[in-house]
């Protein structure tokens, strides 16, 4: 059995999005690259070679460092087909409205420049489910549309869950941002979230990690 992965979390001070770096045999797998310089420094300090990036969804706070990572490292990007489409659009990846979004979310306290950008299509895409092995670790990705068309959940070794922008501590599921669809979430996204194993150590796209239990699911109406 491979050693239990202990993800390293990098939180973007601007958007509070979480990037996770998983390591195995001096190699790295990165989930939702957000801050290039911090990721690069961590990889260099720990002498890690990044091999893959997995995206939980297409919003810009979860892909902000994707272009720089591709420019400076030889790696592959994995995400859902819908996410791959979304990262190529300034509307779907939210960069077109990000300055305004951050301004209103901060109640007028935050004025920042957030130039729109797009990314190239992912190297590996899937529609519903993707199974793979990375450095002896089992990777299971499953589509969970609703927050965005391309949202997914990721389970590693049946032990840890990366939930993207679902199960953010203290927040309801948001479907009002670009690409969000309440009806799709009710019909498809919830079906995926209901089926996730419990209890399981969970690392969300924002906020701290926690144990996902049936009780937590019930708080989100997942009966």
Task: Show where each model-derived region lies.
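Short Gly/Pro-enriched turn/cap motifs at secondary-structure boundaries
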Residues: 10-12, 121-123, 142-145
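Small/polar loops that bind or transfer phosphate-bearing groups
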Residues: 10, 30-32, 55, 79, ...
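Short Pro/Gly-enriched beta-strand edge/turn motifs at strand-loop
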Residues: 1-6, 110-114, 134-137
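Short, basic/glycine-rich phosphate-binding loops at helix/coil junctions
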Residues: 18-24, 105-110, 167-168
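Active-site HxH/HxHxD metal-binding segment of metal-dependent hydrolases
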Residues: 36, 44-132, 218-221
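Conserved beta-strand hairpin/beta-sheet module of binuclear metal-dependent hydrolase folds
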Residues: 2-46, 153-164
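Metallo-beta-lactamase
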Residues: 28, 131, 138-223
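A structural micro-motif
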Residues: 5, 48, 75, 137-139, ...
